[in-house]
């Protein structure tokens, strides 16, 4: 994608990125209870990621928001562990390396924050993302960690940073 940039989220991005996240969950049939689809914080990501040791990155192409991803210190995770959260890309932005680029930004930021491990929660419906996570070095866990409240996610993965 030409003229693509990754930048920190801004307050004015809230509505667009929330719409993208929900659109993608509908696209994959993953718009179910216990996911970010129904999580009220999805509408306020700028505010959510103003918390200490958290960051959210927006992917923009030709001046249009096409996705994003973040790092969050989810309560209840083991010491030194953060969560990779809300990695979503519009169909037009997939398959071009942008998802990996977003994750690499998150990895660097997590290391900068002092984290040594990164956890994520996902669903089988998001099969494209699962392949990306596997290629990035995430391995499967037998159960969930932390207290994200996303009981609709039934796949859990971890990566050493």
Language model features with spans:
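Acetyl-CoA-dependent GNAT
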Residues: 4, 8-92, 103-105, 109, ...
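Generic detector of contiguous secondary-structure segments
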Residues: 6-14, 115-124
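Glycine-centered loop/turn positions within well-structured domains
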Residues: 15, 96, 155
